[in-house]
């Protein structure tokens, strides 16, 4: 939600700040950037643990997916779409700039089975259920 050039009334700005602080673990601020956090669903099926993120408008090449043994971290950058001429915003709700989202992963998943794919503006990361095999930190390639 933090964007340069955004204007709003003081109550709205205060709400954005409070929401930003209460949502995160402080990790994004520690990395030096004000980051937005994509909407995320986490669910399981009979055979898999699935993390689904709303990352509409992103180039998958600008998304990094990493698993560090107990959490999945997704980070990247969404650029503002170019528009001809000068823009005068009436409403500005689409987050742009850097983002980071850390999602705890339940015990009982096979870390080595992690697969990521980007389809229709959503990132899906699937882990097979099974024997709890904690994995070392590793990058997960995104199937496009």
Go through each PLM region and give its residues:
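N-terminal leader/pre-domain low-complexity segments
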Residues: 1-52, 73-75, 79-84, 141-144
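Short coil/loop residues immediately preceding or within conserved phosphate-binding loops
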Residues: 37, 100, 137
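Short, well-ordered beta-strand segments enriched in hydrophobic/aromatic residues
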Residues: 49-55, 125-127
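Core FKBP-type peptidyl-prolyl cis-trans isomerase
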Residues: 59-87
